[in-house]
Regions:
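Gly/Pro-biased beta-strand-loop elements
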Residues: 1-108
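Secretion-targeting segments and adjacent low-complexity export tracts
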Residues: 1-8, 181, 187-192
């Protein structure tokens, strides 16, 4: 089954558009890790003004994560992954239910923001742009102290609906094939 943290800590992301700062707290609400927080990005450059509903329900566009409070689970120090998953770095955890499901999107995670800058909608943490940095080692130590159970995301993005004219039509599932993360030896799937 899934490894949901029990009685764990929390992650708080605050920012504007699609970037900001993240702080971690332990189960007692005490800040752990860098007291100034960690820089984060979500989505591709140029997606800062995408409204909440589109962030929630438009997979495959590289939009930022929608604002909200979600479960954090299935943390994995998987080491380097190949090809399209290289950008995850050496560790990741799912955000949302199941395999990182938020609205109509899946594969939503928190991971190191490996260069180039930006993610497909995950929360990418700025720890130097490559795996194995001192910043990353400190972050992972703080992660284990926090044992985060929830993440609260607030990019202050505009609310409002979708402008149907400029959007391509979607199939019932145009996301990358989903794979269950609770199979032994499975790798995370790229976000959509």
């Amino acid at each position: 089954g899934r490894a949901y943290a029990k009685g764990g800590g929390s992650i708080d992301v605050k920012g504007r558009g699609n970037s900001g700062r993240m702080h971690m707290k332990d189960a007692d609400g005490k800040t752990v890790g860098n007291p100034f927080g960690y820089g984060v990005v979500s989505g591709q450059p140029g997606t800062e003004t995408v409204p909440q509903e589109m962030r929630r329900n438009m997979p495959g566009e590289g939009y930022p994560m929608p604002d909200g409070t979600y479960k954090v689970h299935s943390f994995d120090k998987h080491g380097p992954l190949g090809a399209s998953l290289r950008g995850l770095g050496d560790w990741s955890a799912y955000i949302g239910s199941g395999d990182g499901n938020i609205g109509k999107r899946s594969g939503m995670m928190i991971h190191s923001d490996i260069d180039p800058y930006g993610t497909l909608g995950c929360i990418g943490v700025d720890l130097g742009g490559k795996p194995g940095t001192r910043a990353e080692k400190g972050f992972l130590k703080a992660w284990s102290m926090s044992n985060p159970e929830t993440i609260s995301v607030d990019f202050g993005a505009p609310t409002g609906g979708m402008d149907g004219n400029s959007m391509r039509s979607e199939t019932s599932d145009n996301s990358i094939a989903k794979m269950s993360s609770n199979q032994s030896g499975s790798k995370p799937t790229p976000p959509s």
